[in-house]
């Protein structure tokens, strides 16, 4: 199968030698507000991308293994080094360790399994992606994150995705960056357009839909995707933009949600149940569902709605009590 898939095109804004901050995207989705309850501990996230810098100080404690399915390094399966930068950036947004330097990921105690399916040019064969998904299933991961896509609906790829979901794995993918800002025109990319996949669009820090973000009926939600600071090879940091950057926010969030929900329900939730828990934690932004799906990922949405309800309930009780006094 010689047909090609690529990293979702993205823009490099700037690179930095050193930083020490919680990235704005992590803050925007309210991840720090739930870290006292959950940090993603024990949740295994497979990152299907260009590999990863396993020696990056913000990532090395989180990486539990890796596998190479590309033609880089003469196809050596044991070498999953990132020569591109894209995969390392994605991994950092998901689970960069909280330490005294660098950045912090959405789920700073989640485990990362690096599955290299795109080569140094950011390109790969559909076979590599398919093999990577089956490897993730074999390794019993909880979440698969893919910031990649191609124009073709390949049945074998769809079948691999279905098998992952049937194995109770949450599969998410970037919606794509071919958008024109018009929700009346659809831009389709695969595997993001498969119904079984959680398709992630992008917004900016003003909560406006990113013009480049694909619009179609399969978009599930949106997350920050412009000017996203994260890790890059060589122990450095960089700011990228794209739906590729939005997707790992959702992967990290699901690691947080899975740990929290499983503890609350005292059992392992199924893939559909965890998807429902994710969608409960979104807020509408007023765009077409083709642009934003269910809305912006917002991890404290449930608690904030509960507070509003409690305030209204108390106000109602006080109002009733006043009437009785009269």
Swiss-Prot record:
Family: Belongs to the peptidase S8 family.
PROSITE patterns the UniProt entry points to: SUBTILASE, SUBTILASE_ASP, SUBTILASE_HIS, SUBTILASE_SER
Peptidase S8 domain: residues covered: 23-303
Gene behind this protein: isp
GO MF terms, alphabetically ordered: serine-type endopeptidase activity
InterPro entries (alphabetical): Peptidase_S8/S53_dom, Peptidase_S8/S53_dom_sf, Peptidase_S8/S53_subtilisin, Peptidase_S8_Asp-AS, Peptidase_S8_His-AS, Peptidase_S8_Ser-AS, Peptidase_S8_subtilisin-rel, Subtilisin_Carlsberg-like
Record flagged with keyword Transcription regulation: no
SUPFAM superfamilies associated with the record: Subtilisin-like
Protein EC: 3.4.21.-
Residues of the active site: 49 (charge relay system), 86 (charge relay system), 244 (charge relay system)
GO biological process, one term: proteolysis
CDD domains assigned to the protein according to its UniProt record, in alphabetical order: Peptidases_S8_Subtilisin_subset
Enzyme class: hydrolase
General function of this protein: Involved in the generation of beta- and alpha-amylases from the large amylase precursor.
Protein name per the record: Intracellular serine protease
Protein keywords: Hydrolase, Protease, Serine protease
Organism, scientific name: Paenibacillus polymyxa
């Amino acid at each position: 199968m010689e047909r090609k898939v690529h990293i979702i095109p993205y823009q490099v804004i700037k690179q930095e030698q050193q930083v020490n901050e919680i990235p704005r995207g992590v803050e925007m989705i309210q991840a720090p507000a739930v870290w006292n309850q959950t940090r993603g501990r024990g949740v295994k996230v497979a990152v299907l991308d260009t590999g990863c810098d396993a020696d990056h100080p913000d990532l090395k404690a989180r990486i539990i293994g890796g596998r190479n399915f590309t033609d880089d390094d003469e196809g050596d399966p044991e070498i999953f080094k990132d020569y591109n930068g894209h995969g390392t950036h994605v991994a950092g947004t998901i689970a960069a360790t909280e330490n005294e330097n660098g950045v912090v990921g959405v789920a700073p105690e989640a485990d990362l399994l690096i599955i290299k399916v795109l080569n140094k040019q950011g390109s790969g064969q559909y076979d590599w992606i398919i093999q990577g998904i089956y490897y993730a299933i074999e390794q019993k991961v909880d979440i698969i994150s893919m910031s990649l896509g191609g124009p073709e609906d390949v049945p074998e790829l769809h079948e691999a995705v279905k098998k992952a979901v049937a194995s109770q794995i949450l599969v998410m993918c970037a919606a794509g960056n071919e958008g024109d800002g018009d929700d009346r025109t659809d831009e389709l990319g695969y595997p993001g357009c498969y119904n079984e996949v959680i398709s992630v669009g992008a917004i900016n820090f003003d909560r406006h839909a990113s013009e480049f973000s694909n619009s179609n009926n399969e978009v599930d939600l949106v997350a920050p995707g412009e000017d996203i600071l994260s890790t890059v090879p060589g122990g450095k940091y960089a700011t990228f933009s794209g739906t590729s950057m939005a997707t790992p926010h959702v992967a990290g969030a699901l690691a947080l949600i899975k740990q929290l929900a499983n503890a609350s329900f005292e059992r392992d939730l199924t893939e559909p149940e965890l998807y429902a828990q994710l969608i409960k934690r979104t807020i509408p932004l007023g765009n077409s569902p083709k642009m934003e799906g269910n809305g912006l990922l917002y991890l404290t949405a449930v608690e904030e709605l509960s507070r509003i309800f409690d305030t209204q309930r108390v106000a109602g009780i006080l109002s009733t009590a006043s009437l009785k006094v009269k």
